[in-house]
Amino acid sequence: MTQSTSAPARPHGNFDLLRILFNGRAFFALIAIIIIFSTLSPVYFSTNNFLTMSSHVAIYGLLALGMLLVILTGGIDLSVGSTLGLSGVIAGFLMQGVGIHAFGVTLYPPVWAVVILTAMLGAVVGGINGVLIAYFRVPAFVATLGMLYVARGAAMLMTNGLTFNTLEGDPELGNTGFDWLGFNGLLGVPVSVWVLIAVAVIGMLLLRRTPYGRWVYAIGGNARAAELSGVPVKRVQVSVYLLSGVCAAIAGLVLSSQLTSAGPTAGTTYEMIAIAAVVIGGAALSGGRGSVGGTLLGAFVIGFLSDGLVIIGVSAYWQMVFTGGVIILAVLLNSVQYRGRKKRSTAIPPSSKPGGVVDTVTGNRNSKSAVVS
């Protein structure tokens, strides 16, 4: 006779509801935050405050999208906060004028040149991280931790610990418009939010519609197997850190534009916020799992929670406690989710998987039904 084994029927009802709530936890957490703080403060979800909070979220979101690419490959980038600060300082330095003492002149680059040069700086910082990690086998934690101090120290050296103020520019010098990113809006929405949307769309297309996106997920799943399959693992690793640096530089430009000033301490601990946003969005720190949409939700959860605590007058120290608790809870829930998936996949009988059934005597897989006499 022929023996066959079927997978047990999956329970429905309450189980499905719990699974929906669990998988959509970032979205439901955001809704809960909005409801709670709207109850505690009538101005929390007013139009003006919502737009202000969204402009703050834009900075977190830009950092988190770059961090997502790194985490998808199984890496980590602790230098994004310092890269943000250094990028802002570079932009401020350029806006103040670059003196060429040999010729006795001072150059004032236009804003578009400042933006390009600052983005290039972020690419250089991220590229160095990537080369150290991919080609010199330096652990990502160590390489990016070192770059955190290098970038922050460079920002301090350039400013002597001071802040570049009044970055509006001068019409006579042709370098006005730097504050456009921070204060202007299109269709009633802050420009910084449009920048975040543009970067998110590019990231989504990159991960979903291109071979590069499949490579990123493959490396996070199993880097060795991906390399044996022909994936250019080292080049992809360098590129994700490079893109993370560019995203951090753009975030630095947005923040400096919003403040019309650039200080060497800007972005301190922002790397933790970026990691938190990615994890809250459902990404696995081990790599291979995560999405742009989830990361954006995570950024909104962090941003709306932080601003809500400020509005109701909670101390900045308690804000750190709440943020840390959210990170721990998010990591715990992710661990439960992915451990549960692993258990379910290993619990499925071999005969229910494609490729034939298993001989119930020998345990060998055959392409035809195993016959037991």
Which role fits each region the language model picked out?
Residues 34-98, 103, 124, 131-138, ...:
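Single transmembrane alpha-helix segments in multi-pass membrane proteins
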Residues 110-118, 122-129, 133, 187-263, ...:
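Helix-loop-helix "hairpin" substructures at the membrane interface of multi-pass membrane proteins
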Residues 100-147, 297:
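Alpha-helical transmembrane segments within multi-pass membrane transporters and channels
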Residues 16-53, 58, 253, 257-265:
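Helix-loop-helix hairpins and the membrane-proximal interhelical loops
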Residues 140-209, 236-239, 258-267, 343-373:
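Transmembrane helix-bundle core of multi-pass membrane transporters
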Residues 26-39, 67, 119-122, 148-154, ...:
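Hydrophobic core segments of alpha-helical transmembrane domains in multi-pass membrane transport
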Residues 242, 248, 258-324:
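Transmembrane alpha-helical segments in multi-pass inner-membrane proteins
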